[in-house]
């Protein structure tokens, strides 16, 4: 993980990027197409690099935030604190609303900043009710517990079909089953489509 981050960042520098001009790294806490989480030490190396070079670590939690991974935010699996967190979708349960969370010294730099979906009253009211249900119904804990059950079932499938399911990926209620061509690690899109149709 950390070595891979070093390789990636050094490739940027070889292409002419000046390390002192890197304002921020912006990442999703996982890649949604396959519930692919980064290695912990990759993100930790990114955090260390950001601190050393006075740049920001910004995490996009628009898709991954609000409990679906078994933690309130997906970045919590990495043991780092981002400087800014971008939120949307899950914050209100369905209505258009976005938010940027972060360290107060950054948020207070320009209090006039606004956004299209940042303060619409109906969406804000829905978000408050939605967030209350997270606490009252312990939805994050529930996602974590159900995720452990789901992992057990997925591992049973993986054990039953090792030729087709070489690996699974995810946390909480976010999982991907990688269905591959028999005996290989090449994804089998046609077979996957047939399964989805059934």
Q: Which residues are covered by each model-predicted region?
A:
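Conserved N-terminal phosphate-binding loop of PLP-dependent enzymes in the Aspartate aminotransferase
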Residues: 1-198
């Amino acid at each position: 993980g950390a070595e891979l981050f070093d390789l990636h960042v050094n490739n940027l520098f070889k292409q002419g990027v000046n390390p002192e001009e890197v304002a921020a790294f912006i990442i999703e806490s996982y890649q949604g197409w396959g519930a692919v989480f980064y290695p912990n030490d990759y993100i930790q190396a990114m955090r260390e690099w950001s601190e050393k070079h006075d740049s920001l670590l910004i995490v996009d939690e628009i898709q991954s935030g609000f409990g679906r991974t078994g933690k309130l935010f997906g970045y919590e699996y990495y043991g780092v604190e981002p400087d800014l967190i971008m939120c949307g979708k899950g914050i209100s349960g369905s209505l258009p609303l976005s938010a940027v969370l972060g360290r107060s010294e950054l948020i207070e730099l320009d209090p006039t900043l606004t956004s299209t979906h940042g303060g619409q009253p109906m969406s804000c009211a829905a978000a408050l009710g939605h967030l209350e249900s997270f606490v009252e119904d312990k939805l994050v804990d529930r996602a974590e517990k159900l995720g452990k059950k789901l992992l057990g079932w997925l591992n049973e499938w993986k054990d039953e079909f090792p030729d087709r399911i070489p690996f699974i990926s995810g946390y909480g209620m976010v999982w991907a089953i990688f269905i591959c061509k028999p005996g290989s690690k090449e994804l089998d899109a046609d077979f996957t489509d047939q399964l989805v149709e059934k």
